[in-house]
């Protein structure tokens, strides 16, 4: 069974043929991305993994005509089916399997139905390609151990109980997410993104839960994904200092 650094191809930037030209201030092709739902559980299957994904997009200054803002249609770009019509939201949740090709188009309109732009994602599949240990592409510093358990992705995970122990994952990505374990002996971790601390995340819970997405970060950008880094640092929580690394999800451009 393969384990888990999941790599996901996503986010194209081609303009929809035949669409009306969008004003520069409106929703643009690069204004869509896919991230992962914090607190959700990643499921391992016979062919890979399934994760709770979220398509997100920017509405832009879509009410320049002063008629009211805004609504969006979410379209399956492969089948042409409209998945959500005239939603005032700027996100759409779905289950994403590693062998499932996904491609979306988001069309936005003002309150009178005037088209104000489209955004696109192109995600042929995401591929789980990590063997044991399931987070082999991460770099570890400090005291870490490996636990073998059928509940972990790929059958094993890394854990540390020492303050300052860290795990770093880097790549040319559009989105990064950390998968861990929660439980009564688990504590907090400091999250650094591209060298800057952005959050302190608790993995403490009354009962044990495996394969949890506890942090995700997505970036907006053009066609070339830069190198981004996520570093998980054990905060050394008194009385329950364990921090696990079961893997990472990384969205990359097609």
Regions found by a protein language model. Give the residues of each.
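Secretory targeting and sorting signals
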Residues: 2-26
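Glycan-recognition surfaces in beta-rich domains, encompassing non-catalytic CBMs
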Residues: 26-75, 79-254
């Amino acid at each position: 069974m393969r384990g888990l650094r999941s790599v996901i191809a996503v986010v194209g930037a081609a303009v929809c043929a035949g669409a009306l030209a969008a004003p520069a201030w409106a929703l643009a092709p690069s204004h869509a991305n896919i991230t992962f739902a914090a607190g959700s559980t990643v499921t391992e299957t016979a062919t890979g993994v399934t994760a709770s994904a979220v398509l997100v997009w920017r509405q832009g200054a879509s009410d320049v005509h002063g008629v009211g803002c805004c609504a969006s249609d979410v379209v399956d770009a492969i089948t042409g089916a409209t998945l959500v019509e005239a939603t005032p939201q700027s996100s759409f949740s779905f289950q994403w399997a590693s062998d499932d090709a996904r491609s979306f188009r988001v069309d936005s309109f003002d309150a009178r139905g005037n088209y104000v732009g489209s955004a696109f994602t192109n995600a042929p599949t995401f591929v789980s390609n990590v063997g044991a240990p399931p987070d082999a592409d991460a770099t570890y510093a400090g005291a870490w151990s490996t636990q073998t358990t059928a509940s972990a992705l790929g059958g094993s995970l890394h854990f540390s109980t020492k303050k300052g122990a860290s795990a770093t994952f880097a790549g040319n990505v559009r989105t990064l997410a950390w998968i861990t374990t929660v439980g009564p002996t688990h504590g907090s971790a400091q999250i650094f993104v591209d060298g800057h601390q952005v959050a302190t995340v608790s993995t403490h819970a009354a009962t044990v839960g495996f394969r949890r997405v506890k942090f995700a970060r997505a970036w907006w950008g053009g066609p070339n994904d830069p190198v981004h880094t996520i570093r998980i640092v054990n905060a050394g929580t008194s009385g329950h200092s364990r921090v696990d690394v079961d893997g990472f999800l990384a969205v990359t451009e097609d």
